[in-house]
Amino acid sequence: MNTVHLKLLSFTFLLVKGRARSAGPPAVARCDFRFHRTVFQFFRTMATNTNTETRQPLGLKKAKQKEPLRRVKTKENRSKRGDVHGPSTVYLQVVGAGSRDNAASLYVFSEYNRYLFNCGEGTQRLMQEHKLKAARLDNIFLTRLSWENVGGLSGMILTLKDTGVPECVLSGPPQLENYLNAIKSFSGPLEDIKLSVRPYTETYKDDTMTVYQVPIFAQLRGDSGKLFPKSGRISPSQSPASPRTDDVHINSRGDSPGERRKAARDTSLVVAFICKLHPKKGNFLVAQAKEFGLPVGTAAIGPLIAALKDGKSITYEGKEILPEQVCTPTDPGPVFIIVECPSEEFVEAVCTNQQLRRYQTGGTEDCPALVVHMTPESVLKTDQYKKWMERFPPTTEHLILNEHVCTVHNIRSHKIQAQLNTIHPEIFPELKSYKTKEPQAALHVPNVRAECLLKFQLRPVMEWQRDAIPSCNTEEFVKEASEVSNFLEEVDKCRKICSTDAAELSGQEQKYPEVVFMGTGSALPMKIRNVSGTLVNISPSQSVLLDCGEGTFGQLCRHYGDSVDDALCKISTVFISHMHADHHTGLLMLLYQRERALTTLGKAFSRIYLVAPVHIMTWLNQYHEYCEEILNHINFIPNKSLCDGAEVSKQRTKSFIQALLKKNDLEKFQTCTVRHCMNAFACSFTHQSGWKLAFSGDTMPCDAFVDIGKSATLLIHEATLEDGLEEEAVEKRHSTTSQAIDIGMRMNAEFIMLNHFSQRYAKIPLFSEDFNDRVGISFDHMRICFGDFKILPRLIPALKTLFAEDIGEMEERRERRELRHPRGSSSEVNSEQKTTRAANVSRGAKRDQEAAATHSVETKRLKTS
């Protein structure tokens, strides 16, 4: 607790104590309790609002993280023994297989340590779904500073901080220091976690292995622009120039901005990692030892085992016993290598690197068990790279991560979509996969194509393991739903009603505008709901994206499949409501992939109109200057310039606004500040044909938003929390279900779609009594048009039936909470967690525990991200 908290709480205690003493008779003191409680809550609120980066959820103590402390003690005990005894179990596991929607990332496990190699967008979501614990990570290795490798790193760091991880070290290119400084522009100070960058020249050693970092420099053609490893090209030097410095970039030094940026964001460096496990002493064979008469099971055996495992012969009762007679051989420690060769321009540098060559020509001890290639197919096809792979010993296995994979990563998302699809196939379309059209390279070495959760075990037995690879069986998912009591009956009713509605609306169907929900959850990506992103397809050729949280591009891939490039090319405008990470950290990947899509389809490059808080330019400027080019992708329009009555002084901004309206056939695009964090905005836009859409972003109920959304055809409003949690909603500056519906009624909106649900409502939110035939709830990958407004409320009975078990568990939690805190006091969070721990006898109890853990991290993220 910081100094401000202590002073305020101490003052509150003295004030309340003094009033209690002066209250006189006990009856009066009891009557005064309401005053005490009010005063205490007032000062506590002031204290928690003083520093938005360090405040904790009310009723929750800051996590002390027993697990990391236990690990520290274990390490101390190992060091006291003075025994560098390698771990018994080590394996490497694929997280992201390198597909277009899930960039290459690897998780390395030992009983002593956990490591992550690369952290693209969606990595955290996959780890959460597949139960790979981020809380145990203490080292993250990055092969290259590209958004494909670091897109999920800011979110991962925030999660590590929120879960109480004390320290995390990043290894890789030196620009990582600049990256960490850049993300602080929106994450705020990261004081609760110690972050450091290990220079790429340093060797790293811990209880599991020694990691040798191998810097590899390529000679890039032309300028050092944005590198596209998947398509094997550098963005053309004739790309439009960066926006003028007086609008979006401040150059505080006298040197040439172009030269300085080029030097600072050097893209010619990749870092390979040579990882050698520590030797592991052989195992003592008890049965054989007994045959030799050794005193197994007595105190005398300890020193004998130690000597034998150290490779020394012993003499016992006149008999010489050799180590190999009673111990398995010592494991010298296998080697694995991770190398990224992102384009053909790196092939020469990789293939001639002397540090890597040693492992092609060295002795048995240096023979790598595995080489991991994060390498596009265009590189694998080159003769030089093929020959380089063939120079490794024939016993070396090769693991390849690139777009030439056909694995499904997000199983839970596919499962729920398949089940929803049975209710309404058009509103809940089946998910798709992007498949590259590039032929697969013919390789003459033992190689395996990556799949999500594929393992290569290094110890105790060296082997491939496929038992953890998830299965995506749509038929099984649908069968599971069909076995839910009364579900099929409700689906039949729903379809009959929808058919009747469709017949009545025959000839009135209107395909556009079409709204596609890409992310409907809050705070952090989870296995079922991704974070904020809503695509509005205004016409067959133009789209607007409302918020762009981490993983939005991956969601687009899974929604559109092979047509994702067409969808990307149509996006002309992106609106960012505010600078919390769950609303904007998917922007860069979207911009880079959109440029790739335009090139692939042979279309002229065009910039996106970015309507966002002005503070986003601090982040984009720093990333552009020190990491990769990005400013040449945008025409920036500050949110405040679209507020009612705003004076726009810059002619450039005025021209951008007019171009945005013309491009999207809009009559008006308005914004207003809302009641959330600093510089949070909502928006509304009116089409030339007369329809109007209003989007709340994150906010408490807000009169200004009601004004700009008057008579909206569609209102998309956040409903983060259920009714009964109004105090928590105020604390986190969000809306409850009924509050969101009330805003729509005051707005006189034709239809209200609720959105941005707390991740505790993973599958479905709790319904309020205010639900009516003008209200619907959003799901990831849900696709609606205005003609669906009559249908959407008719889906609710089938949805309630499908998720009846989840709704029942949420209602039980609510009842327990209300029993303990009838007025919905702010300490409900802690009480709910204790309750879920106590109810540890059912399947529902386990879900409660998971919900409570998610709630804890989400609570911190909602308040500090």
Which sequence ranges carry the predicted segments?
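Residues that form ligand- and interface-recognition hot spots within folded domains
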Residues: G96, S110-Y112, E121, K131, ...
